[in-house]
Every structure is written in C-alpha cells, then in structure tokens.
C-alpha cells in the first residue's frame, strides 16, 4: 500500500465551524488541521514515471495553503469491508489513464488535533464530531489502513437446526438475524422445511424475511379487517384498486410494476439512432410515475439514507416495463421540531430522542443534501416537494401523548417517459440469461426491508447500522445509459424483463424477476460481482448494495447487450438462467454446495395472510383558545414555522434545469421566490405539451379526523395542480403514500377509515385513479431514558402526489402577482363555503395546541366545480396569478403572492365571516386568483354557479406595504419587506449552519432590499431572427461531436440545441475515442457537455481531462482537433472544467483559469443574470452587451488563477466572454447574484482566436423560452441563448 499526502481537506470556515462545535461540546481543543491522505493498493510497484503520473492525478481541488501537521493524528477512512464511491471512481480514472498496476485507490482524512489531555468521554465526543460511524472508522495510524484492502477467504453459509431443535432454533435465529418474522411465518417456515426434510440455511431465511417483510409484501394493506367487531368486505388495497375499477381511463399499467404508467402526449422524442446521430422520433410519450419513502435509513444516517432513497426511486422508474427514462423528481421531508440553535421557537419543547437516531435538525441539514446530490449527479431535476415539522404533546385518539416525526418521512418520487411497446414486461424465455447490471456486491445494507418494517428502536443498534446503504449516482447514470440504449432500439430492445435491486438485494430481486414471469432460475453465487471475497453467501445474496438492476436477455442478444455495456463502462454479469420449473437454485462453486434450493412457492407463494381486529377511537381535544393570541405575534410565528417559511435552503442545492425540459420549477418570477404550486415539464424539445406534478399532505389533521386528513391531502394536490392546462380530472393520476404507526391504539381503524374516504368515496366521485403508492407501517420511535419508557408516535400520514398531462405548458399560472398588467382584482375562492375550522392548523401548532375540529372537503362537487371553471380560465389565459390556500391560511397565500410579485397589497376581508384569526389563518380548501378588474365580476359568477363561494378581497398597491382591513378597521399592516425578512429567516439560519455563513448572510440581506430589481433583461439583438437559416438551406449539416464521459448528464439537451441550429449532432462517448471507434477528424465542432464526469472525484472535470492527457491516442486526437484552424469547440459546466485543464493542448488558452469549489462550498442551482462582454468568441457574435438570465448548476465554478497578475492578464486579453451581473447591470460581487464567488463575476472565457469557448452556466438548458424559470412575456419560441448555437453554424459556413 502506497500512502500519498494530499491537499488540505477543510477551508477556513469549515475549520471554524468545527472549532465552534468543539467549544459547544466543552472540548479543550486549540487547533485542528485536516488534509486528504490517498491510499493506493498496487498489484506491483510503480516506476518513477508512473508514480509521478499517479501523484499528478491525485493533485486536485482549490489551492488551500497547507502546512506541516502538528498535534494528535485521528485518521478517518471508509469502513473496512466497504468501497467508497470516491474509491471506485478514482480507480476508474487511474485505469483510464493507463495505470493498470493500481488495484484500488482510497481516500481518508487525517485530522491533526492540538488539545489538552482529553478524557475517554471527551475523546469519544471528538471522534463523533470528526466522523460518521455509520460509514467511517477512526484509525490510529496511516499504516492501519491496510485493513481497507485486506482480502479474506470466503465464509460458508450456516444452517438453523429446526429438525432437531424445533421452533426454538428459528426463534433465536429470528432475533439474531433481525428477520422480523411473525409467529405465523415461523410456523409456516417450520411446516415447509419439515416437509422438505431439511434445515433452512441462514441465506434462505434472510431471503424469505426480506421478500415477505411488510416493506415488500404490504401485509397490512392486503390484510383481512374486523373493525369494532364488524368484518370488513375489502382490504385496504382493494379499496385503492377501486379507483381504477371506477376510472380506468388513460391508465396503461397499475399495481404490477415498479411504477404506474398513464397515457401521455404524442411528441418528438429526441435521442440518437444506432448510428449515433440524434433525431426526433414522433411517438406517444407515455408517463410513468412513482413515489417512494426511505424513512428508516434517513433516521439513522440522513445523507446516505436520503441519497439512496432517491436512487432507489430513480431505479424503479428506469426498470418500468422493458426499460424507460426517468425525467423529473420531487422530494419531501416531515420531521419533528428543528430547534435551530439560537432560533428555538416557543412551541418547540425538548422531549429527547434515542441515541441511535439523529436529531431532526441533523436530518434537515444532511438528508436534503443527500437526496439532492444523488439527483444532481444522476442528472434528474428535482422540481417540487414539501417540508413539514411537527412534534407536539396533544390530546388525540389515545389520550395525551407526544405525536411527531422522530422517525422522519423522506419522500422521493418523480415521473418519466416510456415507449408504448415497452409498457408491459416481456416474456422471459426458457434459457434466458439472468443478469445483474451495476456495481459490485458489498457488505452493506443488510436486512433493510425487515429493519424498515420495525418501529425505530425495536431492532438492535448493530442491525440498524447494517441496514444503511451507500450511494454512487454516477454508476446509476451509467446503468441508465445502458437502459436508454436498449429502449431506443425499439423492437430490437434486448431487455425482456427488468427489475431494480432494492430491499433485500438480489435475494428479493432475482426471485421477483423470475416469479413475475412464471419462471424459475438456476444461479451461480460466484458470478455475482463482488469486491469483498470474504463475504458469506447470505451477505453476497442479501446485501443492498445500490445502483443495481436485474434483467433477462435472450442468449442470442447477449453480445449486443455486452457491447452496449462496454461502451457505457457499465459493469454487468450473467448470474443465472431462466428455467421452466418455478424453482430457485443457487449454486456455490467455491464450496461446491447449494446455499438455496427451494420451490418458489415456499418463498413467495402462500405465506400466511394477516388479519387485523381493531377498534375505533375518537379524538377529544379542546378548541383553540384565541383569546391569548395577538395577531402580530401570530404572524411572526406562522412565518417562521418551517412548514410555511421560505424553503430556499432545500431548493438551490438541487439541479432544476438539467434535461432542458423543465418549464416550471419551485422558483417563481424575476425575484426567484420559492412558492410554485406544482412542477411542469415539456414532453420534448419540439412541443408545448407536457407533464405536471404536485403534492398534497395535511398530516396533523389525522390527530383529529382521519377521514379529513385524507380528503384534504387529495384536495390539496388538486388545488396545487389546478393552475396548469390539464382539462379533465381523468388526465390526473395520484400516488398515495401511507405512513402509520400500525398497532397504536386507534390508528389501524383510522387508517382503514382514511383509505375508505378516498378509495371508495372521494376519488371515484371525482373520476381520479390511484394507480400507484407505497406504505410504511412502523412510524413510531420508542426508547428508554433513565429508566423511563418514551415514545414519539407519528400521526397517520398520507402524502398524495398528483401527476397530470398538460396540454399547453405555456399557459401555466404561477403565484407571481403581476403589477404590469393594468387594473386587476384579487378573488378569494372558498370551497368550504365560509367555514373557519382551525383544528390541526399551523396557527394551533405554533401555540402548542391542536384545536377541536379539522377542516375537510365537505362537498366533492365544490372541488369538481372549482377545477372545471379554473381549467377553462387557464385555457383562456384569463388568470394572471394563482395560489392555493393551505398551511398558514389566507394570510400566507397573500404574502407569498406579494413576495413573488414584489408588490404591495390592499386587502379587505369585510365579506368574510369569522374572527380576524379565523379569517386569516384557517386552512380550509381555497385559492386566490388575480384577474383583470374588468373580468372579475363575470369570473366570480362562474365560480358561484358551481357552488364555490367567491370574495373580491382587494388588489395591488405600489407601496412596499401589506394592508389588511375589515372595511374601515385596520386588521394588520406591515411592510412587505419586513414580512419577507421574517419569512426568510428560517432558511437563512439553516444555510448559515450548513454552508458558508457569509454567503448565507449576503443572500438574506439581498432579500431585505425592497427595491431590488430582480432579473432584468437587455438585448442587443432579436432572438427570433434565425441567422443560421441561409446556411441550413444549403442542405449540408456540419458534424458536431456531442462529447460525454461517464457521469456526464447534459448531452441530450446540448445535442438538441445544436440540432436546431442546423448541425448533425452525434453522440460521442470518451470510450469511442479511447478505443479508436470514432475519430475527431470527422467533426467540424466539438462540445464537451455538463454533468459529473467520474462523479467529480479528483476535481470537477480534472479526471476527465487527465484521462485525455495521459492517454496517447486521446491526447493526439484532441491535440490535432484543437490545432485545426477550422474547428470550433464549446465546453459547458463539467465540459468547461475539463477543457480548462487541457490548456497545454489548446492554442490561445494560456490565460484560462481553473474552476474550483464554490465560495458557498455548496452545489448552486440558480437562475442568474449574465452579460456578454466584448470578446472574439465565435459563439457570441452580435450578442455583446446583452444581459440575460441563464441556468446555473454547479459545485465547482469559482475561477482560480495562479495569482493576481494572472487574473489581470486574463482581463487584459480581451477574452472574457461572460460575467455575472446584478439587476442593475453592475458586476455581481455578492452571493447569490454571483453564485460561486468568482472574481469580477467571471464565468465564461474563450481562446484568443475565439474558436474555443468555455463557460460554467448552461445555455443548452434554456435555448427554448419555455425552459426558462422566468422570461419576459414577449419572448417567442427561441430564447436569446439560441443565438449562440446559430452563431456556431454561421461560423462553420
């Protein structure tokens, strides 16, 4: 093992945060210094040249001053027996650079701590601050890291001797292995193995436990029910299926695959043909939808828990039918009170928690980063979601107890597209090859299905830790590229059948694969790719290593599939063959035995069916005491409640523009305020049809009324999607995610009541189907605190996600109030017809009360009538702004609309009944719309005719003021800016804790500027003019290489932009260059695309660049291309970072900077203003002086020059192409207008001759106007950024 010292690991502010944490923990630490240490396992020694090459590869990242280490060494590495994602990707880079002697690279962090003598307890506290024991260990010395590369002999399986010891043996194994088997399941297993006349092996028991866990089998939803002594006719699942039986319209697949599928629009799907040339393919683009939860792992270790939750849901989408394409995602979190240090709120008590789970604050600081990072690296925009905090001592169905979310809800979901012929799974032919696609097996994530099926605290701490997985999104991206290549082949798609690998690992995935196709399988254990030879058969077969799929391919198509995998560098292995007999055999060639030899019917067939015999409990809770509430204090509390408050800290960490198909993300208007009701995507680059997603959840209401909570969740999801052009309820489908503390008094009967309310009543009445969903039935946390038993039990929690087909995405209405549209009126639409129920409201919560009566949707017809009228108004473009009433009531609805429009309001509530608090803060179903003053009366009449009460409540004012009156009486008045400051303080506090606090402060101060102009556009050209048209008419399309490396994810939208400009866009993978299949000699242009090549390990774009510089063939190809006078090249984001590291072979680029970690030290996804500078770039001809917004999505965009003189030389060269500017057109120096902290706002630069340009922002994602988060009304189909690509076409001639 070679030990290679690296760069400092922590910036100054990260060291400061660590020192503050030590101080808060009363640790006598005076100084901490940290640096990376690289560990190289070698097959044979390196020569001097190879060593120098390896050291060069391992030199990356920003230039932070290092110094001689002093103090006690604490060396943190990944846990032995695991391989970190960093390791696999860094090793890939080394191999692609020709360093075949490097068996594996790994990285640790060496902390050097100067401190007084620490007690054993203090040492434990310090180690807890420096590493995550879920995924890391603390080693005493560098040499001890040899354990990371240790290779042990394979372990054997063990048997449980039930034949001799009977039931007791299985009961002991049940506890030891964490199987969570019920008594009747133990009886079932004993009966079957006695019949088979043999003892079960541990691997068989684990496989059975995972496949039959509540997590996988949904026993409660399939159970027989008796409630209050009365036998119920339907199971929960049958009531959900009732929605499909009543309204099967437009549903193509439900209840049987990894995701549901609904009929989509016909549009031009854009992808490369087998020859690599991108083309449009006009066909139905059906919509798949899925929403998952990953609650248990997120409670234990939030970052990997949320990351793998997102990754698993993405795999579900990709493994639908015979392979499909994930498109856009969503996320949601529900946790107990945050108790932000220095910002603890009056309603946030301190009830404690078990040691094995993290705090709600830690979940929300780390979990969203994990989910966002996976989506970012995979290349899926996350464009809607929700966040709720709730933890309260309440009187509910079970008397007075603490209800909350110590076991959090972590929601991951999304939609995708699938070809018509691939919606249904194919036939697995006898003899078909059964394949695992993706990364290797590792000894992680054991027993996750069973563990997540237990209440937090029931399993042992070791088993909790074992059930957490690790994420590698770049590997999943490679697998998805393989799936894409397969479905793009249409009729010749080699995939017959596909499933993702999730809970239970291969032990669940392979049996499910063959069983669903009425086949059996013969498998060879040693064919499973594994980087840990010492694993037992149980560990190999049952681990939940991520980023894996199982699929079947006919033998005659195996070579075709293998070639696709080789090009995409996606590992795969043939593990077995399909058999006619439905029997499962797993052979172990190492020990020459069969760890599994079972009929599939024992594993999956007739396990005992659950019965639930439960009683109903009624909640008794006093009414909210309004007498003690002062309105101004209520406003302050409501606006700082995380459920209501600004959620920027959850949004800007996630890429919202990748694919170039996002029409509506969370950020609204020129001031980019996060208040959007729904997410909208375009079907394709050549259409205006699309898809929409929205969410609805009102979980605290279930503490008063289960029925109301469910009805309100469905209604809210509809209200949130109503501002899009959908047309009919039948074009909306719902996902229902049910969370419940099953077995808790009153909760089982309440769950049945809630399912019945929407499955038998509401949804059938509306004509809406629920074709997909998920349940999590163990939402309770139990622990002992100094001899006292404590529990925190969640409310029954239904999270609804609505998916809709959009007819015209241009007609979507947002909450942005328009002060530039002439006289207008605000109409309040009340579907409750004047009721003001405050039970379960945010107002009650912030005063530590629950209230007595929950709001509900009393009349289904009101929602149906509202939607009908609203859809007609949207289609007619008669509504200027729209926002629903929900958490925080009418007051929140109004101020959020004012924030988005940067306008004042004059409101009169005289026509509304109730107290001031009731009128402003009730959360009955409703909405506010802004319409033309001339049309207001007629529009109001349309709603009234459908039974919806409509109030004219006022309009806009130019002053920075929110005035709310009751006739002549002033109810409330304050400046909009003061309210925005309150609303944004929660996100500021979270950002300051998590990110660079200086950046957080600058953003918070910007939000307090009443006169901030927002995004302002100034164009020096007509974007509708097609300067390339004369050249396109010549009929010859110049060839553009759309270059990607493994992990790149922005190539399709780049190809579409160049295709529109008249180029022949061709898909070129780096493996094509390295293998010699393709030469750059064929191309007039090259574009290096954005994404996460090699997951950005070894520096963003640096690994990609070094794989070119250290490979003779690649270096020659690129050198010749750049030296050719007629060639042009563009590098965007990751491609920009990569090309900046090729300066030595790009003429005229000597003055280019490197691009390193953003000043915020956070991935930044923003819609930022840039201005085109005077420069020679061929791409910016005729655009100089133009100021336009553009998508920004990167973690390493800060320009780094060698010194101040190098920056001055670059400025003097005249090659600066783009700068970030503020709304006044001045160079942006403050965050987030300058999102990465680059000197002088620099974000684009070109060579001295202008042929090669690199830039960090993404013009390819916004070349269509509809793909911009905001744009002026007068823009046509093409945004101004389309001019860049047309300029390139003009240059080629």
From Swiss-Prot:
Transmembrane segments: none
Secretion signal span: none
Binding site for Mg(2+): 677, 716, 720, 884
Residues at the catalytic site: 1133, 1258, 1260
Annotated ranges, domain Glutamine amidotransferase type-1: 1040-1293
Superkingdom of the organism of origin: Bacteria
Database matches in Gene3D superfamilies: 3.40.50.880, Phosphoribosylformylglycinamidine synthase, linker domain, PurM-like C-terminal domain, PurM-like, N-terminal domain
Pathway it works in: Purine metabolism; IMP biosynthesis via de novo pathway; 5-amino-1-(5-phospho-D-ribosyl)imidazole from N(2)-formyl-N(1)-(5-phospho-D-ribosyl)glycinamide: step 1/2
Coiled-coil ranges per UniProt: none
PROSITE patterns in the record: GATASE_TYPE_1
Amino acids binding ATP: 305-316, 384-386, 676, 886
Segments of this protein annotated with the region Disordered: 307-326
InterPro entries: Class_I_gatase-like, FGAR-AT_N, FGAR-AT_PurM_N-like, PurL_large, PurL_linker, PurM-like_C_dom, PurM-like_C_sf, PurM-like_N_sf
Keywords, alphabetical: ATP-binding, Cytoplasm, Glutamine amidotransferase, Ligase, Magnesium, Metal-binding, Nucleotide-binding, Purine biosynthesis
Assigned GO CC terms: cytoplasm
Recorded catalytic activity of this chain's protein: N(2)-formyl-N(1)-(5-phospho-beta-D-ribosyl)glycinamide + L-glutamine + ATP + H2O = 2-formamido-N(1)-(5-O-phospho-beta-D-ribosyl)acetamidine + L-glutamate + ADP + phosphate + H(+)
Subcellular localization: Cytoplasm
Gene Ontology molecular functions: ATP binding; metal ion binding; phosphoribosylformylglycinamidine synthase activity
Subunit: Monomer.
Database matches in PANTHER family: PHOSPHORIBOSYLFORMYLGLYCINAMIDINE SYNTHASE (PTHR10099:SF1)
HAMAP family named in the record: PurL_1
Official protein name in the record: Phosphoribosylformylglycinamidine synthase
Organism of origin: Shewanella frigidimarina (strain NCIMB 400)
